[in-house]
Amino acid sequence: MLTITFGTAGVRAALRLLEATLDPTPLNEQTTTINRTASGVEWLDPVFQIISSGALFAWGGLALFLLLRHLPAPMDWRLRAKDWLHGAGLAAIIGLPGLAFYFSAVHLGLSRNVAPSGLADNPAQLPLLVLNSWANGFAEELVVVAWLATRLRQLRWGWPAVFAASSLLRGSYHLYQGYSAGVGNIVMGIIYLWYFKKTGRIWPLVIGHGLIDTVAFVGYAVWF
């Protein structure tokens, strides 16, 4: 599962960070773009963007399928109204301090400048950014939290080891942004897994992640 999803992404991101570190240009003078233009042909670019988002939804869907098939006890998968409230709270807890941490890290030379969107300045691209935001949230939380934690517990891993594995995996595939992105996402991983362990609810995590990315991606596209 991890080989075809975020495990490989983590290795690739670590190598990207190594490449950026070896570059003579200081890390905080480099820029990395999250949502890049995928084609120079205007009408083809949205097609590529939708395919990329679809792949992420497929990753999350595979994790969901495996959970439904192999869970020893059924999990409550219903989406409740309070999930949106909890998700918004998680987004605020992670997003606001995370933004301050990012700017501090850039100032200290521990992060590249991150451009959340490199798509064309076109209002028609905004729905694609929203789609990708929620695709990220769905894939990451289903795979890195729900599936991975459940599978490791089935393999009799203790909770400290599960926390380490899940949070380090989340940090690894964000390393292409800089060292601070790895650390910040490890912290996010610990908080998100703690919530999942405490409540058994995954949708607030998906919602929180989707809201964070939507604000970052769409906000950047609108203001910059």
What are these regions (language model features)?
Residues 2-12, 53-67, 91-104:
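Hydrophobic core of alpha-helical transmembrane segments in multi-pass integral membrane proteins
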Residues 8-20, 145-146, 150:
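Short helix-terminus and kink motifs of transmembrane alpha helices
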Residues 99, 103-224:
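Transmembrane helix-loop-helix hairpins at the membrane interface
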